[in-house]
């Protein structure tokens, strides 16, 4: 067979065909795959994308907590670089004739306030006390505000205040002189107002304790909103509120609340008739009051923590000004009636007057004695006697032996008197504690009543639509030993408070039980 000669072109064609020959991909599965679903080729050309992360985040050095907590030793010289000469004292002596440097002289110059050049800076320099500083929002006030306070001025003022605020009533003589000065100042005529020079007094009246009405305890009743009825006008509403009463009640669940009673039309006519005839009440008349509102109550008195004394003034024409104490503060807030709980919406308070019993008269006399009490002066006399006895004992010790024995007897007598005085003080403290407890109980009794008057009530009275019965015996203490206090009337409010027509009531509620109450 003749040899076959392969030319260069044929050689290139054969190489080209072999290069395009595809090699089947080997499957990773041992067995033959019958159905295969290979991914299609990417339809886009490859391109470069910017790497958004920091390339040093994997190689950046971070100190560990061990390195952070390590404390390095600070090696310094013992004298901290300051050489102190302990031998020659003239080293640190200052020459008074030395001239200061120009830079140091500027530090000793007084600070002179430069005049403001712009109106805006003048406006920002003003301090308005009723506006809130916006220091956290804007720094304009700090940039334009000119401070008139200097450290030197502050130092001087603080030293001066220390002398003025110093307690000058430490010894007995200074206290006596200060008390006598108050009487001298009270005798000086009042020519003008203490802070308003153009205001002059029209009338000057003395102020005294109200000895006449002090026997009756007064309370301040604060409402969260106007308790006046909505359907009444201004003058009629004031007349009704001047005769109103508050009374403690209880709902079906046993929750206590305060009811606000307003007089009816018939009761208003009776009270107006009594006022025209100059009577406090008619003995046989019955006064009806209908419930208007329900309140939750909060009482504070002298026995309560954080109690602040409160007084009110009564102006009596031609007589002067008298002050009285409000020893109880009652704060009333509107009460929400729960669903399904029946309240005393239609309750009627029936008031009938009676004379005061012996316990009430004794309580009035106790309050009068409390106002007229002069125990502090008696204690001062006891202290003066003890001091004189002590001085006599010292003089006796300087004398003969018999005088020393007499002084010893006097000292023993003074010691026994001191022990008696201490016992009396303890008894007074116990009496004060018991009086505070009695006052708290009396305040609760004023709102929720007591069971002392059960025997005075003959029978229950008919109430409103729901058949509730409530009766009351109203006690008056003005004139014939009776008074009444209206729940909404204030010391300055109605004509009844100025004329001192105040009723002290004891009312029945529920099944005809009689409970005493003072409503203010």
UniProtKB/Swiss-Prot annotation:
Protein name: RNA polymerase II-associated factor 1 homolog
UniProt feature, compositional bias: Low complexity: 506-520
Name of the gene: paf1
Bilayer-spanning residue ranges: none
Residues forming coiled coils: 351-447
Key word Transcription present: yes
Quaternary structure, from the entry: Component of the PAF1 complex, which at least consists of cdc73, paf1, leo1, ctr9 and rtf1. The PAF1 complex interacts with PHF5A.
Entry keyword annotation includes Coiled coil: yes
Keywords: Coiled coil, Nucleus, Transcription, Transcription regulation
Composition-biased stretches (Basic and acidic residues): 359-374, 396-407, 437-447
Protein location: Nucleus
Family: Belongs to the PAF1 family.
